[in-house]
């Protein structure tokens, strides 16, 4: 009860008769271009994520050193009054 080879061939012939070979060629090239664009976008996204992770890893170190500088300059007012 499944699709046999004969059914698939008849289906493809009907599709070619309805759309024509030129239109099918255009659809195929458009689909190929879309797939290529998607793959390129995924590669760019991976690079961007890696750059963001590296920047995020470097950020806490800079933040800690800034906090240490602030801590050395703070004065505990309550300690002086006691």
From Swiss-Prot:
Gene Ontology annotations for the cellular component aspect, listed alphabetically: TAT protein transport complex
Membrane topology annotation: Single-pass membrane protein
Pfam families per record: TatA_B_E
Transmembrane feature ranges: 1-21
InterPro entries linked: TatA/B/E (IPR003369), TatA/E (IPR006312)
Entry's Gene Ontology BP terms: protein transport by the Tat complex
Domain of life where this protein originates: Bacteria
Keyword entries, A-Z: Cell inner membrane, Cell membrane, Membrane, Protein transport, Translocation, Transmembrane, Transmembrane helix, Transport
Keyword Isomerase: no
Role played: Part of the twin-arginine translocation (Tat) system that transports large folded proteins containing a characteristic twin-arginine motif in their signal peptide across membranes. TatA could form the protein-conducting channel of the Tat system.
Subunit structure: The Tat system comprises two distinct complexes: a TatABC complex, containing multiple copies of TatA, TatB and TatC subunits, and a separate TatA complex, containing only TatA subunits. Substrates initially bind to the TatABC complex, which probably triggers association of the separate TatA complex to form the active translocon.
HAMAP family associated with the record: TatA_E (MF_00236)
Annotated family: Belongs to the TatA/E family.
Name this polypeptide is given: Sec-independent protein translocase protein TatA
Species annotation: Leptothrix cholodnii (strain ATCC 51168 / LMG 8142 / SP-6) (Leptothrix discophora (strain SP-6))
């Amino acid at each position: 009860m499944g699709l046999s080879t004969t059914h698939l061939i008849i289906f493809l012939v009907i599709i070619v008769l309805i759309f024509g070979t030129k239109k099918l060629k255009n659809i195929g090239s458009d689909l190929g271009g879309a797939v290529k664009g998607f793959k390129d976008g995924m590669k760019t996204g991976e690079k961007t994520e890696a750059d963001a992770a590296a920047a995020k890893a470097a950020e806490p170190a800079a933040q800690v050193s800034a906090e240490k500088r602030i801590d050395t300059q703070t004065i505990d007012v309550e300690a002086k009054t006691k």
